[in-house]
């Protein structure tokens, strides 16, 4: 496992699994799921965490207790509550946050 840099990826999307896999060679990755999705296939060195954090304050505490350097919010686009909690937690803990945003859907012939 790489030394130093720790990232929490809040997953639940295919993009999140791909991202965790891609960066697991250079970051210590913890991949978090709400528990409502099936277990993803992740590299052995990625830590899987299942279940909620208990709100923004508890998430901020978790980030600090686990020496987290970065947070990537790759949750489902409609997961508004967790997205807001992640934003607040990162602001409280002083940790940089990246929000993965999917491109907007555009209709194509046959839709």
What is each stretch, according to the model?
Residues 3-4, 68:
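Phosphate-coordination loops involved in phosphoryl transfer and adenosine-cofactor binding
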Residues 5-35:
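N-terminal basic/disordered segments at the start of proteins
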Residues 8, 51, 75:
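Glycine- and other small-residue-rich loops at beta-strand/loop junctions that grip anionic moieties
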Residues 20-22, 43-44, 83-87:
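Short amphipathic alpha-helical segments
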Residues 25, 43-46, 93-94:
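Short, structured coil segments at secondary-structure junctions
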Residues 60-111:
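Glycine/small-residue-rich loop that forms an oxyanion/phosphate-binding "nest" at active or ligand-binding sites
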């Amino acid at each position: 496992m790489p030394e130093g840099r720790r990232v929490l990826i809040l997953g639940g999307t295919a993009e999140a699994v791909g991202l965790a896999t891609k960066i697991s060679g250079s970051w210590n990755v913890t991949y978090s799921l709400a528990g409502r999705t099936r277990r993803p296939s992740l590299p052995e060195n990625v830590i899987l965490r299942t279940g909620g954090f208990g709100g923004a304050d508890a998430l901020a505490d978790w980030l600090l207790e686990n020496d987290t350097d970065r947070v990537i919010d790759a949750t489902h686009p409609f997961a508004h509550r967790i997205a807001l909690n992640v934003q607040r937690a990162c602001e409280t803990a002083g940790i940089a946050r990246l929000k993965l945003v999917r491109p907007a859907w555009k209709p194509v012939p046959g839709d």
